Regions:
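Junction motif at the cytosolic side of a transmembrane helix
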Residues: 2-14, 141, 230-233, 244-268
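Aromatic- and glycine-rich beta-strand/loop motifs that create alpha-glucan
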Residues: 2-51
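Short amphipathic alpha-helical coupling elements at transmembrane boundaries
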Residues: 29, 33-37, 104-108, 177, ...
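Hydrophobic alpha-helical transmembrane segments of multi-pass membrane transport/permease proteins
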Residues: 37-66, 70-89, 188-195, 248-251
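Residues that define the loop-to-transmembrane-helix transition and helix capping
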Residues: 42-43, 71, 114, 152, ...
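Hydrophobic alpha-helical transmembrane segments of multi-pass membrane transport proteins
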Residues: 54-61, 70-142, 160, 169-170
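Membrane-interfacial helix-loop-helix junctions in multi-pass membrane proteins
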Residues: 65-66, 146, 197-252
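Alpha-helical transmembrane segments and their short interhelical loops
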Residues: 113-187, 191, 236-247, 251-257
């Protein structure tokens, strides 16, 4: 059993022994546990922090001297960072914890379910903040991408993206039967969305049918909002439609997550 599972079980026993904690204390305890588990997982740290830099280096070399293309790629990588830290991470982790019985044990403790998910989401938000800082700094200092012209819009769309993709990640975890099949399920959603949503290319260059499909994808609307704030200095109002789309996807994710989420391991 992995160190992360053992850490979760120790935390679960501590919660049970200490009686019902306050909601805030329980959420904070879960957040700290998630941070410890994250930093003890080198693979997670690599994909969260080094991979965006590698992508920036790759596309910076490919699009060297083509500033318009770099202005497209940097917000796209920022959007991918949000999705990877929330949707992908939660879908993987919740499936793993459910399969090993950790979620069922946590459900039997005095810790409220909302406190648990708040701690988990808070950890994902911390990763997003660090990733965006890395992408923005590298994009500005190394590749000459302009600094965000509207920081408020950047914060709003980043927060909307975190909430949206976190809810969708929790919802997807219910559909995944076991941790072995998690990569197939996650990549079946992530890879097509990444290719269609215009993350690495100007969407105007795509065929009309792909542009139509992209219009319904949450990643496309997140990248549009981030691009408006980071590259064009546009406020939230300029991309109100994208913010609404993220809100609608959040509602879908929350409904599916609440109605379908299971704390119990699947039967073989």
């Amino acid at each position: 059993m992995s160190e992360g599972v053992l850490e979760s079980l120790r935390a679960e026993r501590a919660v049970s022994a200490g009686g019902r904690p306050s909601w805030r204390r329980a959420a904070w305890r879960q957040y700290r546990l998630e941070r410890r588990m994250f930093w003890r997982n080198p693979t997670a740290a690599f994909f969260n922090f080094l991979l965006p830099l590698l992508l920036l280096a790759l596309f910076g070399a490919v699009f060297s001297g083509r500033q318009e293309d770099l202005d497209v790629v940097v917000p796209g990588i920022a959007g991918l960072s949000v999705m990877s830290a929330t949707f992908i991470a939660l879908a993987y982790n919740l499936t793993f914890l459910r399969e090993h019985g950790v979620l069922k044990r946590l459900r039997g403790t005095p810790m409220p379910a909302s406190a648990y998910f708040t701690g988990v989401a808070g950890s994902a938000l911390a990763n997003v903040v660090l990733q965006l800082a890395i992408v923005i700094a590298a994009g500005g200092l190394v590749f000459g991408v302009s600094w965000p012209g509207d920081w408020a819009a950047l914060v709003v769309f980043a927060a909307a993206g975190v909430i949206c993709f976190a809810s969708l990640g929790v919802a997807l975890s219910h559909a995944i039967p076991n941790s072995e099949s998690a990569p197939a399920y996650v990549n079946a959603v992530f890879l097509p969305m990444m290719m269609i949503a215009g993350v690495f290319y100007d969407e105007e260059q795509a065929p009309a049918i792909l542009r139509d499909v992209a219009e319904v994808l949450p990643l496309k609307h997140l990248v549009d909002g981030l691009s408006g704030a980071m590259v064009h200095g546009e406020g939230v109002g300029a991309h109100a439609g994208s913010l609404l789309a993220l809100g609608l996807w959040t509602a879908v994710g929350l409904v599916l997550a609440i109605r379908g989420f299971s704390w119990d391991a699947r039967r073989a």
